[in-house]
């Protein structure tokens, strides 16, 4: 597949400068083969060591597609069904006993969970706090049983992004296989796909080199300061993946091209609309977002964000093209940059506006006299309250 390498590298280098990014790795695959890979900037500020395509980064929520894949593999092995009630697999979670939440609802974030304060109470192996309550999936069950909260909607009715839902999927996986989540991922994903520079959590970091340190902008806004990885075992199934852009590209290529990789159905099945965006071409499947473009093209993708980490992985099935990005600072615009890379390869095949990110807002979507009904106080146990006014 033809592309202008000089133009692509100008795009990536420009992003480094524009968004004050310390280090960035990128990889593009076509038909499962690498056609572009590179690194820009620093992976370690104290040693001035540079990023390359084999540098390992935390990729946060991109972990979710791995967790979803294992659940679908388990369904193919006939040891669960995604239509099973979650309460059948986690009977000790009392808040689920009167609900009809199924595994498929956890996969596409439609279980109805509100924002919960779980991450503020979870054990960080690098930064233990006195009020830490949760290290394991079983600890999560105990915590949720004590927490007073109301569900947002009936299962399947509303997308409400929930890390806790993916923690519960991790709990189900460990109970199904009677093994740690780390062991199951290694046996069912890393080893079969030969993802040789991927692992879960930081406990295996000592066996690898070339790991990017997470950074944040210093007080003077001119320098970068190292921070610790957030290493919370409870969230391993929601965001614990450490990997390279090469391994990420290979993973999404297998999922996208084969469609299942030993799973019962593609991860794009069981989708629900993302109603926070202003048209119906955006949806969420099982650990993947799904964008309907034009000419019957479909982009499957996900991002990851947490302190010191920004990532993107995407796959365009019709062109068998994958893009992976990793950055060692939070809040980098990886979704926008990932789409801009796709544009360089697609040329005139897809209307550029279809790959725009964030999506273009339709100013006529709401009449001015409708806006008042959205004012008021909003909030959650996870993020606190905020006021919306005209």
What are these regions (language model features)?
Residues 39-41, 228, 311, 327:
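Short clusters of small/polar residues that mark proteolytic maturation junctions
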Residues 35, 312-329:
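Short, well-ordered beta-strand elements
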Residues 2-59, 79-81, 142-152, 225:
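Short, conserved catalytic-motif segment at the N-terminal edge
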Residues 7-13, 26, 32, 58-84, ...:
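Active-site SXXK
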Residues 324-385:
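Short, gly/Ser/Thr-rich active-site loops of penicillin-recognizing serine hydrolases
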Residues 57-60, 159-161:
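Catalytic tyrosine of NAD(P)H-dependent dehydrogenase/reductases that use a Tyr as the general acid/base
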Residues 33, 98-312:
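Short, surface-exposed loop or secondary-structure junction motifs
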Residues 81-96, 193:
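Short, glycine/proline-biased beta-turn/loop segments that scaffold the active-site neighborhood
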């Amino acid at each position: 597949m033809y592309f202008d390498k000089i133009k692509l590298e100008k795009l990536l280098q420009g992003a480094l400068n524009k968004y004050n990014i310390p280090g960035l790795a990128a990889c593009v695959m076509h038909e499962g083969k690498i056609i572009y890979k590179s690194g820009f900037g620093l992976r370690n500020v104290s040693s001035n060591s540079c990023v390359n395509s084999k540098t390992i980064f935390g990729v946060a929520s991109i972990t979710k597609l791995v967790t979803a894949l294992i659940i679908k593999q388990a369904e193919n092995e006939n040891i669960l069904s995604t239509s099973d009630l979650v309460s059948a697999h986690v009977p000790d979670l009392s808040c689920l006993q009167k609900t009809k939440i199924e595994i498929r609802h956890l996969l596409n974030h439609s279980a109805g969970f509100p924002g919960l304060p779980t991450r503020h109470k979870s054990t960080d192996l690098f930064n233990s706090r006195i009020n830490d309550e949760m290290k394991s999936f079983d600890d999560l069950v105990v915590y949720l049983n004590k927490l007073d909260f109301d569900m947002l909607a009936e299962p399947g009715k509303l997308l409400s992004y929930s890390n806790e839902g993916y923690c519960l999927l991790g709990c189900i996986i460990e109970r199904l296989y009677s093994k740690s989540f780390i062991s199951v991922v290694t046996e069912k994903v890393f080893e079969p796909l030969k993802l040789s520079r991927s692992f879960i959590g930081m406990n295996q970091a000592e066996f690898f080199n070339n790991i990017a340190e997470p950074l944040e902008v210093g007080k003077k806004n001119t320098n970068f300061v190292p921070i610790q990885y957030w290493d919370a075992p409870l969230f391993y199934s929601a965001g614990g993946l450490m990997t390279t852009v090469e391994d990420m590209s290979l993973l999404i290529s297998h999922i996208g091209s084969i469609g299942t990789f030993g799973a019962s159905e593609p991860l794009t099945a069981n989708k629900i609309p993302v109603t926070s965006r202003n048209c119906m071409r955006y949806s969420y499947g099982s650990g993947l977002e799904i964008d309907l473009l034009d000419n019957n093209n479909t982009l499957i993708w996900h991002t990851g964000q947490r302190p010191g980490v920004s990532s993107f992985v995407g796959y365009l099935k019709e062109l068998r093209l994958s893009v992976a990005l990793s950055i060692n600072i939070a809040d980098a615009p990886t979704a926008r940059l990932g789409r801009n890379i796709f544009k360089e390869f697609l040329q005139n095949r897809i209307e550029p506006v279809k790959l725009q990110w964030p999506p273009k807002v339709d100013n006529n979507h709401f009449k001015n006299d409708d806006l008042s009904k959205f004012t008021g106080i909003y909030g959650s146990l996870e993020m606190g309250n905020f006021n919306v006014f005209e």
